[in-house]
Amino acid sequence: MYKVDLNSDLGESFGTYKIGLDEEVLKYISSANIACGFHAGDPSHMEKTVQLAKKNGVKIGAHPGFLDLIGFGRREMKITKQEAKDYTKYQLGALMAFASSNGCNIQHVKPHGALYNMAAKDKELAMGICEAIYEVDKDIILLGLYNSEMINSAKEIGLRFANEVFADRAYDNNGFLVPRSVEGAVIHDTKHAIDRVVRMVKEGTVETLTGEVIHIKADSICVHGDNPKAIEFVKEIRKRFELESIEVCPLENIEVCSSENIV
């Protein structure tokens, strides 16, 4: 039996602006990445999303990003390692308060948008994020792109980590996500996307945008829940996983890694 986590970015509404179908997607995932007020979200929605996750038995993770509501955290910003560390601690700490007051723990941290993509390649930013998590609670899991600087930094300091793959995104030959601006970067065909996910979980490989086959490790799969079609996609993944004997469970129930248990 294969095991894999299904995660989704949630709690991204703020004020009177509603983003995503959180109540629906929470029925099908095992881990929630909750926005912490920088790129999206606000205190009221953080509280509500934590409560919804708890109600559905979904584990909670912090989803820190750049302080960029207008750009939804998808625009690159030039920051130092210390700033990356401070931003992560600040947002993680905020969500920890909501989690603790609702009788929950923080399972993981997954950076958002441009911060995620930059830290995948920038060792300094990656180390800042990992050090922040380790100093707050070394048992929290970093969720990051396979073979990225985030994962390498986690290994270096002994932070627990899990490798994330994306159901609907294309990869380049180095294992990084193809920018959304490139044609073919987002996979719209449901069957093709699910076939790719099953292959990543069971075979540990993925075909890149140029047709090359590369190695990949899938501990967790990112799925979206921001529109009705996305919800149907998540449902189809769950159905296919049952046929393929793939069990969906949260990261804490999967053998995640640290530098201490890497052979």
From Swiss-Prot:
Keywords, ordered alphabetically: ATP-binding, Hydrolase, Nucleotide-binding
Entry-linked SUPFAM superfamilies: Glycoside hydrolase/deacetylase
Gene Ontology MF: a single term: 5-oxoprolinase (ATP-hydrolyzing) activity
Catalytic reactions of this protein: 5-oxo-L-proline + ATP + 2 H2O = L-glutamate + ADP + phosphate + H(+)
Source organism, top-level taxon: Bacteria
Similarity comment text for this entry: Belongs to the LamB/PxpA family.
This protein's name: 5-oxoprolinase subunit A
Species name: Clostridioides difficile (strain 630) (Peptoclostridium difficile)
Gene field: pxpA
